[in-house]
Amino acid sequence: MSTKIQKTDAEWKALLAEKGAEPVAFEVTRHAATERPFTGKYEDNYAQGTYRCICCDAELFDSSSKFDAGCGWPSFSQELNKGAIEEHVDRAHGMTRTETVCANCGAHLGHVFPDGPTPTGLRYCMNSASLDFKPK
């Protein structure tokens, strides 16, 4: 997408509070923090539905691509719509990883790794705090 949704930190905080987002959601989505493993509300959620960006409601993942990676964060094998997620090189913490962000608003979602199941071989390792689940 060519133009991302832009807001001030105060506007993002207000929007997330309005949505009833977890307190850590602002730090995760706007400052690339990571929630602690095995603490996110969607790690063990296997209901059918769609996972959206907590900040802008963009559809990111379908529950059919969710799997248990045993890593402590919700994991998906593919994005719902090509282009919904942007990838950037992340060299923080002495590692080189691929960061994932919402293409619509730039919210930090998590990271993608090349160790997932077939057919994609990818593991989108997401923070629950960056997601909002809409059941089918």
From Swiss-Prot:
GO terms for biological process: protein repair; response to oxidative stress. InterPro entries: Met_Sox_Rdtase_MsrB, Met_Sox_Rdtase_MsrB_dom, Mss4-like_sf. GO terms for cellular component: cytoplasm. It catalyses: L-methionyl-[protein] + [thioredoxin]-disulfide + H2O = L-methionyl-(R)-S-oxide-[protein] + [thioredoxin]-dithiol. Zn(2+) binds at C53, C56, C102, C105. It holds the Pfam family SelR. Gene3D superfamilies: Peptide methionine sulfoxide reductase. The active site is at C125. Its cofactor is Zn(2+). Its EC number is 1.8.4.12. Binds 1 zinc ion per subunit. The zinc ion is important for the structural integrity of the protein. It is an enzyme of class 1 (oxidoreductase). Residues 9-136 form the MsrB domain. One of its GO terms (molecular function) is peptide-methionine (R)-S-oxide reductase activity. Keywords: Metal-binding, Oxidoreductase, Zinc. PROSITE patterns: MSRB. Belongs to the MsrB Met sulfoxide reductase family. This is Peptide methionine sulfoxide reductase MsrB. The gene is msrB.
